[in-house]
Amino acid sequence: MGNETSLPMEMCSNFDADEIRRLGKRFRKLDLDNSGALSVDEFMSLPELQQNPLVQRVIDIFDADGNGEVDFKEFIQGVSQFSVKGDKLSKLRFAFRIYDMDNDGYISNGELFQVLKMMVGNNLKDTQLQQIVDKTIGFADKDEDGKISFDEFCSVVGNTDIHKKMVVDV
């Protein structure tokens, strides 16, 4: 990877050239079939993600072009959101996108249910989970349109330190 590849990466990420080189090495190690893109299985070889119930959602968000794989540019842009230099708003937007599965700018009752179901599995009955979803929507949905906008999401989680936990070491 020469300078011609890393310079645009620096411009579209929170990483400097050395960090991009290190990430490039990590990417190439993960790219087991040398295809230039990471499949879901290759992503799952990351120990940090193996136990994460939301790994598929993370991959979906990283996969900007929706082709089912994450190329190096998508990888850099995705991981960049978890950089210590990443800003709070970007981290909140990423967290919001985990829940906004259809990417329409809102978290619906059904989307919140699906994501929470991924997290809790069968530890709660669906009726219990639905009660939590309904209460959460009722609490966060200030304009009472039945869904949570990004602004409403930020009103609820923006005062927490969630963005400080959304950091990976490069």
From Swiss-Prot:
Binding-site positions, Ca(2+) 2: 63, 65, 67, 69, 74
GO-annotated cellular components: calcineurin complex; synaptic vesicle
Modification Phosphoserine occurs at: 35
Pfam family, one: EF-hand_7
Keyword Metal-binding on entry: yes
GO MF terms, alphabetically ordered: calcium ion binding; calcium-dependent protein serine/threonine phosphatase regulator activity; calmodulin binding; phosphatase binding
Family classification: Belongs to the calcineurin regulatory subunit family.
Summary of the function given for this chain in its UniProt record: Calcineurin is a calcium-binding and calmodulin-binding protein found in all cells from yeast to mammals, and a calcium-dependent, calmodulin-stimulated protein phosphatase.
Subunit annotation: Composed of a catalytic subunit (A) and a regulatory subunit (B). Interacts with sra.
Protein name: Calcineurin subunit B type 2
UniProt gene name: CanB2
